[in-house]
Amino acid sequence: MNSLPNLLCKMVEFLQKQSLILSKNSRDGRINSAFNEDEIFNLLHAHFRINSPNMRDWFDFSFEENETFYPVNIKITNLSTDNLNCKLGIYYALTGKLPHFDNEIRWANFFSTIKENLAENSQDYYFLIINKNDTKDIFATSLKCLNELTPNGNNLPFQANWAKNRILVHRNFSQVKAFILGTMGQSFALRARAYDEFVLNFPEFKVN
């Protein structure tokens, strides 16, 4: 059974007690969110033993607890649907191994690498969720314990609606595989269906 690490729970409690004021320096919400993530990291770094990420790392910060590595992604959100395009976090959760590739790996290589290394493990990819419309509304979750994932053929491999993912769902490893890989498969089926519909209308442009 997966559960949240103690230190991450303490971070949530700490942030909930703060009077967080998130900067809004840009009309672009994505730019503001990226800047806000840095603000949250700096606040946490000043009070907890967390590791700064390198430029191309696949997490916003990490820490060790009981000799286990915990990667965490900060999400500043209005609790709507976000893309979860992190192949490296998915790989870590499904294999228990640190990825030796970057997020630009081709899908075919990504699938084969997961298949070769897929193994029951206790590792996970964590999310620290902060509601930008109510900064007291903060919670943490993880990829394996999400209540639901949303398949999307336009935003691979899938998405998550944070408002529907407050409660942790504990799964055994067989259930985890079905949950993550099954949703991923649905997304690729949607992508393929779009191509089939295109060819149905424009058969002269079918790729041979």
Q: Regions from the language model: what does each represent?
A:
Residues M1-F59, E65, Y70, I76-N208:
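Nucleic-acid endonuclease domains
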